[in-house]
Amino acid sequence: MRIHDLDPQERPRERFMISGVSSLSSAELLALIIKTGTKRKNILETCQDLIGRNGLEKLADLSMRELQETDGIGPAKAMQIQAVFELQKRLHFSRNTNKKVRSARDVFDYMYGRVPDESKEHLFVLHLNTKNQIISHHLISVGTLNASLIHPREIYKSAIRESSHAIILVHNHPSGDVEPSNADKQVTSILEHAGSILQINLLDHIITGRDAWFSFREHELLT
């Protein structure tokens, strides 16, 4: 069925005009953006299929190739979908500029969307000023955290350059299990000692998963 064959009150554009944007489903919102379907399926059916098979969270992370596995989604529509989610990420980033850290949850929220590939471990250092506001962040390494590979010099070099009052380490666990490994604890201990010498406080080390986090500070693993 073509979109124009639907009852006017069921068409996304008309529903938008009558009831407002918040009344639309996720599939209807996406249909407004990519607009056209195929001879086999109208655009609303295509978007319902796309979201139904993936969910919004997974959809936001799909590659161009993965998006095009859905019938009716070609390169142009895949680019439109990726552009929408990229704008959403940038809005989130802009709202978190100079974010004040009061808890590990603040750091978890700040890091949303900043890990480019969740299938690999990424170690970041966040630089904070005297008000505990995040002034910048820096990607240190990609790969399994290991004390023999992570040198304090690499961590604190950027902190000195940014005139940081304190730093927070953040790294992700692709498995989703946020419990710290022995290597995580060893790296944290080494970096906390180095920070005390440089008088740059290691405020926290936070391990993130998909929907959870572990804070060394909140679990009293930092002095």
Curated annotation (Swiss-Prot):
One Pfam entry name: UPF0758_N
InterPro entries the record matches: MPN, RadC_JAB, RuvA_2-like, UPF0758, UPF0758_CS, UPF0758_N
Motif JAMM motif per UniProt: ranges: 171-184
GO MF term list: metal ion binding; metallopeptidase activity
Record-listed Zn(2+) binding positions: H171, H173, D184
Single GO BP term: proteolysis
Domain MPN span(s) in chain numbering: 100-222
Keywords: Hydrolase, Metal-binding, Metalloprotease, Protease, Zinc
Family: Belongs to the UPF0758 family.
NCBIfam families referenced in this protein's UniProt entry, alphabetically: PRK00024.1, radc
Protein name, entry field: UPF0758 protein Cphamn1_0831
Protein species of origin: Chlorobium phaeobacteroides (strain BS1)
